[in-house]
UniProtKB/Swiss-Prot annotation:
Secreted effector that acts as an elicitor that induces cell death in host plant cells. Residues 50-73, 351-376 are annotated as: Disordered. It comes from Plasmopara viticola. Belongs to the RxLR effector family. The keyword Signal applies. It comes from the Eukaryota. It is found in: Secreted; Host nucleus; Host cytoplasm. Residues 51-73 have a biased composition (Basic and acidic residues). The keyword Transport does not apply. Keywords: Host cytoplasm, Host nucleus, Secreted, Signal, Virulence. The gene is RXLR95. This is Secreted RxLR effector protein 95.
Amino acid sequence: MRGASYVAIALFVTVSSQTAAECNQDKPQEGLNNGYVTFSGTIGKMLPRRVLQESRDSKDKSTVHAGAEERMMDPPSEAFKSAIIKTAGVIMTGGEDAIASAAMKTQEKSEALSLGRTSKRRGIDPPTYNVGGQALYALPKPNNNIVSMASDVPIVLANRARVKAPADLINNAARSVSKHDLRLAPPGPSTSSTASFDTEKAFQFDLNKLPDEVEISNSKRQRIDLTPSHVVEQASHALPEPQKYIVTVADSAPNVLARKLGKRDPTLIMQNAASVITKHDFRPAPYGPSSSTVASSVSQIHSQPINQKASKFALNVYPYEVKRLSQETLHPVGHVLHMREENDMFVPSATVNGESVPKDSKTKNTQGPRVHKTDKATGKVEHIHAAFLKAFNLPFHQYPQETAIMIHIVERQVNSPGNRQFVEAFKSLVERLQLPELKIILGTDLEKLLGKESLKELLKKGSLEYQNALKSLREAYYVKLAIMYELFYEFCYVRSDFFDRLVPKVDRTFWILKLSN
């Protein structure tokens, strides 16, 4: 089509030039009206009108009939012929090539545009991996994405905060985000700039470890396999491990304890208990020995006083046991585990069923407090109790009977530690115990809760001192149970597989302990 257009334009231009030349040389023969034949444009005006008779020769091809008038076409000149031949040659050679090239480019662009639209509509399938006989899709990698930040972040933050103008705090936050690199750190080996940071983190982590606990393992405390063994031909999913969670202690723990126990202000016992759990390391002791540092640990143990050694092996030690330990000599052996197994015979640890209670023959009532039949330890209770002890390094002793009562509370419709019903649940247990039994059951927890000097004053003989001591020891027992139930409540919702059904967890306003991963 374009070639035909070019030919027509060339013909019109050539005819116009030739006609204009003839008009200048010869005066045209005028007709009846002395007018011109009207055509569209100026070309028609330049062609003269001639009135001719009809040609008698029907084969004469030199005339063009137009009604009663006819226009005579002069034979084309040589210049006209050469122009037509030249134009046609260009169109047939280079012109057609240019037209074909332009058409090909247009087709390529349209195909690319169509392909782009199609690729946008159809997502790219992620690669699959065969896991347990099933095809699983790999999740997208966040580090492949680019985080974009708006230029009007301060204004957006001000609008969301419902303030008129961006404050200094909002401007600083926006500036910090704009300069921050949100990309993940590469998984490869760290460079020299990050090596010091990693070393600092490792040093800070090691400060929170007990040096001797790294090498000491109790053969009776085995890690529970959290992966179900009954999963067949499926991708097994391990249950969450509580020891991977961080225990957070509230700053207002003394006031929360006073609120729970119906006190107006926190007592000395509540303040001491809050101080104990704030400084306590809830992480469980590592399992299994480390042969690389056994020798250094042995040398460290024998270079320290005996009282420090006892506190390394077990954080909860009876006062008279420490005195007896100081009179004995610990002989160096080839493995630190021997010292843990030997001391397990007379040093209590933060576990129960022979673990939380000293096994000394002089100690009475080593099986825990007396409870009702419904609160006695069963197979389920012992299983949950063992998992609870292995999940944390407990700040106080925990007996299976106490765990049984806590299980009954957590299975209720109202089980939140913020509810004061837990005090009523433990009331029959605490109020039944007398001073000698409380002293044995609380053990070294008494010194933590009451303080060494206060404990000496309370344990003096006399009826008045006896009543004051009984009241204080019962309060200490309530405080200990309140703290332990908060930790047990968090544990139960992490290990909900132990229970058939639990009510939804309550987001507590007032709390003492919480777990955060």
